[in-house]
């Protein structure tokens, strides 16, 4: 019984981010799963900064241990290895994606700490389903609690204390991260920094239909406030996010959409932070029985009050792609990002990409 409970709980806690896993150990109330993938990937685009080989490998483990009848401990680690570097620079770009541990106490929920997904991604993940691109208008790495980031203490409650199936909520605290870097003008890589903050999210999923909302608020760092000396950067003392989303996932159909607004948070171009951004993402996919999964999406993020450029589109594109699954372990895909932003004085000044990109890849995963 202990083994069964641990297996079910750990799978439930971590399955949202892990498609497959190989069981390594399962004995005496302890369970350890190993998972990974290798993706041979290439981008084709006129922009030489993005064109070329993007091959990578990913490895992770997730585990749990039965402490007593009411309490289970769990941990999760994931690492990304770049496969396109020469051997003299083999570790360049490698990174820890996830590293956290915590406890789950019966129907009262779970509490963990470490590098994890921010509660904003509870909504952002619903549209981050494209073969290669997508999920990038407001879900950004190490940007407050919108995506993967560090210093997160997260409480999650599933099925509302076991009373309402499908109703989940979370509360999150993020500690201050200065990201000190003397090579930057303002003494830090301020686009990836954050002050103390909190976030809450709630989702309800029933019979394939889902609806959810999230709110976060954080202090901004001194470096971020100093960066406001450039009028292209945000000047507020707090960073805030409001987002809502819907999804449908049943009968081989997948559809999801979200809308969000951020204040003094969303990054754009080559190291700028917008005063205000409004973003919209929508994706539709269909899974054929013979393995083909076509995908169509539209994404847009508009920045407000961007210095002398006023209001501007920071991201806007249509994405057309398809994935073919040979089996549960092997797949191949193509993804075409049709950029709808035209080159202008604004895009040149802040270095926003305007070219289309085609990505082709083949993936083995376990």
Swiss-Prot record:
Q: What is this protein called?
A: Outer membrane porin C 2
Main location, first listed in the record: membrane
Q: Which PROSITE patterns does the entry link to?
A: GRAM_NEG_PORIN
- Could you tell me the keywords of this UniProt record? Cell outer membrane, Ion transport, Membrane, Porin, Signal, Transmembrane, Transmembrane beta strand, Transport, Virulence
| Lineage of source species | Bacteria, Pseudomonadati, Pseudomonadota, Gammaproteobacteria, Enterobacterales
Q: Kindly give the PANTHER family that the UniProt entry links to this protein.
A: OUTER MEMBRANE PORIN F-RELATED, PROTEIN YDDL-RELATED
Q: Give compartment(s).
A: Cell outer membrane
* Recorded topology in the membrane: Multi-pass membrane protein
